Regions:
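A conserved loop-to-beta-strand element in the N-lobe of protein kinase catalytic cores
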Residues: 78-86, 93-94
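Regulatory extensions flanking the kinase catalytic core
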Residues: 276-320
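Conserved N-lobe beta3->alphaC-helix segment of eukaryotic protein kinase catalytic domains
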Residues: 40-63
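Glycine-rich ATP phosphate-binding loop
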Residues: 22-42
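Activation-segment/catalytic-loop signature of the eukaryotic protein kinase fold
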Residues: 74
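Activation segment signature within eukaryotic-like protein kinase domains
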Residues: 113-114
């Protein structure tokens, strides 16, 4: 039993374990509602990490929106931080892994989740926040919609600034931008020795490009490079060419080549020069579903097993809206 701000919760199990703490699956005694509680022992982690946890609470409170995971309340007791949040059905990473590796993710799903991610990241950027660790595991599926989570290493950019210098941990290597690895004033050939690096909103755009690439091709742009040192060199090398094959290289059954406009979006997001990358707002202005897409008859349908995972978490009107959107191949309103 855990008590947070006078409310009792029954612990049902563990949802996850991170470097700074654990996330528990709980049930509120009074209402029976299922929740997730993030528990962090602030006395057992580094000062910078503890500060990041407290800043995450502040950001969750400030960034409240349908596209951001909801924080209901929090409390600090005897150096233990408890954050009560809504519980999702699964995260995007697990959902993607649940699909057969021999099947390509349907284009309708790619476009749906891509626009959901853009909407969430655009919201935090509009509020001056750089996430710094965008990856499929940090997008939670809640009642059929994606919500952004984990602001532990996010940063706030002041209105009169365009970037921030960070001394905290980097994001996940397969999704990290070149500028987040390069040392300030360095030559870009190796990671920073002092762990200090400079990022801006375009760093999140690179990460989004890596996620889109993985949705389309089944792996991130640098995932085929096994050694971390070689991967770092490739990411930071401005002359490294990222492959955007029009045909499948993994021989998955039923593969459909990505439409040219989607390859162009990936190319723009994965520009080594961050100034050449579009903003998230600009990415949202692209008509992802419409004249640029293949005919509806050529688009693969969403497997029933995946639809069933989405259906049970939607209200009837939301489920009907999703079906209509997939049928007409146009974004949800």
């Amino acid at each position: 039993m855990i008590n947070v701000k006078g409310t009792d919760y029954i612990v049902l199990g563990k949802l996850g374990q991170g470097m700074s703490g654990e996330v528990l699956r709980v049930q509120e005694v009074k209402t029976g509602e299922l929740r997730a509680i993030k528990c962090v022992d602030l006395s057992c982690i580094e000062k910078e990490t503890a500060q990041g946890c407290l800043e995450e609470v502040s950001m969750l409170d400030r960034l409240r929106a349908p596209c951001i995971i909801t924080m209901f309340t929090y409390e600090i007791k005897s150096n233990l931080l408890y954050v009560v949040m809504e519980m999702g059905d699964t995260d995007l990473s697990k959902l993607l892994r649940s699909m057969s590796r021999e099947k390509q993710l349907p284009l309708t799903m790619i476009l749906y989740y891509w626009t959901e991610m853009l909407t969430a990241v655009n919201h935090i950027h509009d509020n001056g926040v750089i996430h710094s660790d965008l990856k499929p595991a940090n997008f939670l599926l809640v009642r059929g919609r994606l919500k952004l989570i984990d602001f532990g290493i996010a940063s706030t950019v002041n209105a009169d600034m365009t970037s921030v210098v960070k001394n905290t941990s980097l994001g996940t290597l397969n999704y990290i931008s070149p500028e987040a690895i390069n040392d300030i004033g360095g030559n870009g050939d190796s990671p920073s020795d002092n762990n200090q690096y400079k990022i801006n909103f375009k760093s999140d755009v690179w990460s989004l490009g890596c996620i889109l690439y993985s949705l389309v091709y089944g792996q991130t742009p640098f995932q085929h490079i096994r050694a971390n040192w070689a991967k770092v060199n490739a990411i930071t090398n401005p002359n490294h060419k990222i492959a955007f094959p029009p045909a499948d290289s993994t021989n998955r059954r039923g593969y459909t080549s990505p439409p040219p406009f989607l390859i162009d979006v990936m190319r723009r997001c994965l520009q080594h020069d961050r100034k050449a990358r579009p903003t998230v707002s600009q990415l949202l202005q692209i008509p992802y579903v419409g004249c640029n897409c293949p005919p509806a008859s050529s688009l693969p349908s969403i497997p029933p097993s995946i639809l069933s995972k989405i259906k049970h978490s939607l209200e009837e009107n939301e489920w009907r809206q999703l079906l209509e959107a997939l049928e007409r191949r146009k974004p949800l309103q």
